[in-house]
Amino acid sequence: MDAYAVQHFYNNARKPLAPTTLHSGNLPAAAYENVMFIRKLVCRENAPGAHERPFCAHHDYNKENLSEKSRL
């Protein structure tokens, strides 16, 4: 997915009032796979900073869909 396709999705193809979290199914499958691949590269290629460690420490970590109880 190129930059134009991502821009088109965010500005034209989204449904009004639809959830916008990464894991909600609101992104096309190819875009979702690209984002997840980039996240994995960031975790493996660079030493993670404090703000990146939650993404890197647990492979099943899902920041967007955490319940309110688990955030406290």
Curated annotation (Swiss-Prot):
Superkingdom to which the source organism belongs: Viruses
Pfam families associated with the record: Baculo_8kDa
InterPro entries hit by this protein: Baculo_8kDa
Entry similarity comment: Belongs to the baculoviridae 8 kDa protein family.
Name this protein carries in UniProt: Uncharacterized 8.2 kDa protein
Organism of provenance: Orgyia pseudotsugata multicapsid polyhedrosis virus (OpMNPV)
